[in-house]
Amino acid sequence: MRKPVIAGNWKMHMTCAQAREYTAMFLPLIEATPNDRHVVIAPPFTAISSMAEAVGGTRLELSSQNVHWEDDGAYTAEVSPTMLLEHQVRYAIVGHSEPRKYFSESDEQINRRARSAQAHGLIPIVCVGESDEQRERGEAERVIRRQVEQGLEDTDPDKLVVAYEPIWAIGTGKTCEASEANRICGLIRGWVGASELIIQYGGSVKPGNIDELMAMSDIDGVLVGGASLDPESFARIANYQTS
């Protein structure tokens, strides 16, 4: 049975002090959250250590916002799997549309990151999705399938998460219709050929649309950006209801 993963990606937000304050407010709000789902936050690297101390022994799990494929070396600004494991990090986001856009990350690099994460016992959250231009040209499915096939090559689909994040819906206020998001997630499941693959939707997820999204048969969680920066908002998302 697929256990949903509700993950908040803080991106380049929150100092260590702000992260501690947030955590103190957030943890009581998820004390009664059902155990049929994972609740995850991906803080900036600088806040991971203090977050690890704050969430120890609670149900809140940590993710990194990236991970390198080497354990150490001359890779300025990168972070290795072994460094993350020191701080009780369980997940690692790879292939997010922002590194793809701003740093020209390739599917091959994303695949190396994902394989390295798995090799060290981390669960990669592999992001895929089309731009507005690709969607308008009718290329969305071809683009997403390429990202899935190349990004997941030689990985174990039972030990990763795929996040479908249409780029045109990230931080824009535009949301992919739940039925369309579900259709794409179903296609991804078919391309991978893994019925138990966890597939998230990401793109302007908020308290107002979480229940509809999570009622979809092929959506197994969400990757939340801006709405995860407010503890009450993210708690409402974590406490989604489908009935």
UniProtKB/Swiss-Prot annotation:
It catalyses: D-glyceraldehyde 3-phosphate = dihydroxyacetone phosphate. GO terms for molecular function: triose-phosphate isomerase activity. Substrate binds at N9, W10, K11, G171, S204, G225, G226. It is found in: Cytoplasm. The active site is at H96, E165. Its EC number is 5.3.1.1. Pathway: Carbohydrate biosynthesis; gluconeogenesis; Carbohydrate degradation; glycolysis; D-glyceraldehyde 3-phosphate from glycerone phosphate: step 1/1. InterPro entries: Aldolase_TIM, TIM_sf, TrioseP_Isoase_bac/euk, Triosephosphate_isomerase, Triosephosphate_isomerase_AS. It is an enzyme of class 5 (isomerase). It holds the Pfam family TIM. Its main location: cytoplasm. One of its GO terms (cellular component) is cytosol. SUPFAM superfamilies: Triosephosphate isomerase (TIM). Keywords: Cytoplasm, Gluconeogenesis, Glycolysis, Isomerase. One of its GO terms (biological process) is glyceraldehyde-3-phosphate biosynthetic process. Belongs to the triosephosphate isomerase family. Homodimer. Involved in the gluconeogenesis. Catalyzes stereospecifically the conversion of dihydroxyacetone phosphate (DHAP) to D-glyceraldehyde-3-phosphate (G3P). This is Triosephosphate isomerase. It comes from Prochlorococcus marinus (strain MIT 9303). The gene is tpiA.
